[in-house]
Amino acid sequence: MSERNVIQELEARGLIAQQTDSGALQKLLESESVTLYCGFDPTADSLHLGHLVPLLMLRRFQEAGHRPIALVGGATGMIGDPSFKAAERKLNTPDVIAGWVDKIRRQLSPFLSFEGDNAAVMANNYDWFGQMNVLEFLRDIGKHFSVNAMIKKESVQQRISREDQGISFTEFSYSLLQGNDFAELNCRFGCKLQIGGSDQWGNITAGIDLTRRLNQQQVFGLTVPLITNSDGTKFGKSEGNAVWLDPQKCSPYKFYQFWLGVADADVYRFLRYFTFLSIEQIDAIEAADKTSGTRPQAQRILAEEATRLVHGDEALKAAQRITESLFSNDLSALTAEDLAQLALDGLPVLDMAGQGDGLIDALAASGLAKSKSEARTFIQSGAVSINGIKAEGLDYCLTGNDRLFGRYTLLKRGKKLYALLVWPA
């Protein structure tokens, strides 16, 4: 992607929801290397899939010759963005937030290049807000914001209209903080463009207005669309839980499986959003899937590309190895690290501490059988295997020989149902 066509490329991918003064922004991007930023508040100890599109946008702009700033909200994270949130956020302690800031900085770093003429910048807004007192804030920033305009914003109106919730002055002031981030980054780094999710539009335009007032600079905003599944449900949830980017919170195997499960109606759109494959390559994949008469390849390609982007080549190979091993019932290739991934979140797990060693008991306790009677029936019908070997004998007791790497026993019932027994170390 060249810097002369970055906006057209993003539009072709469906990645632009809103932008300010599109003609002037396009002209600016074609005429110089532009510094842009996106903010990431530490609301948890990890980023999740909802952060991935704007994060990849920073990388897309950098590959087009522009300079990205990844701003971690050490200050704004202490307040909490109320935009389209139904209730007040819980306030976390400064120590907790500082720890989360460090983790998120480490997560952001691999996506960007910190070398070359357009080397990325990592910033923390606590650096300028931490020493600012309340009088400075009210005099230098607050006087430029109209309460009349602020309460008309849709995100604020939604909260004000709810008698059971309302909005605190703390959260109401959030847009002032984010607005000042833009002005500060413009002053420090010459930043001229802010990107974010479509729910950030009000905060972004507030920052544009403040930067114009404080710095007499024209700056721009661009948002990415809210990502939803084709059925209208929120994207980025697995069984109701967020899909985290931290491999200790969501294993690479679970991450890979999430993408394999993407619906046919969504997969080509997500290839445009979440990969760096060209539009032509994605169109070719879609055309081939429609004419092949076999299972579509798009989900596999999406899973490979997204897992490689977030977790790297080795983690992708491990996710593929685990997937193939479970599918083939041949566990010989699995490593201790692979089984640890499955123990984290890949399979139903039964902690064997305090459990008996009878196979029937393990089947019932793990949920592979509803009762001991049903467990007996499954064993008698040859539907149960232990570490890939068919179980025989109703009175079978698990021994040390059934423990992979001294810790794990993989039970299987039927063709697809697994449970992982984890023995005390």
Swiss-Prot record:
Keyword ATP-binding belongs to the record: yes
InterPro entries per record: aa-tRNA-synth_I_CS (IPR001412), aa-tRNA-synth_Ic (IPR002305), Rossmann-like_a/b/a_fold (IPR014729), S4_RNA-bd (IPR002942), S4_RNA-bd_sf (IPR036986), SYY-like_C (IPR054608), Tyr-tRNA-ligase (IPR002307), Tyr-tRNA-ligase_bac-type (IPR024088)
Motif ('KMSKS' region): 234-238
PROSITE patterns attached to this UniProt entry: AA_TRNA_LIGASE_I, S4
CDD domains recorded: S4, TyrRS_core
Cellular compartments annotated: Cytoplasm
MF-aspect GO terms: ATP binding; RNA binding; tyrosine-tRNA ligase activity
Binding site for L-tyrosine: 37, 174, 178
List of residues binding ATP: 237
Quaternary structure and partners: Homodimer.
Protein name: Tyrosine--tRNA ligase
Organism: Laribacter hongkongensis (strain HLHK9)
Lineage per the UniProt record: Bacteria, Pseudomonadati, Pseudomonadota, Betaproteobacteria, Neisseriales
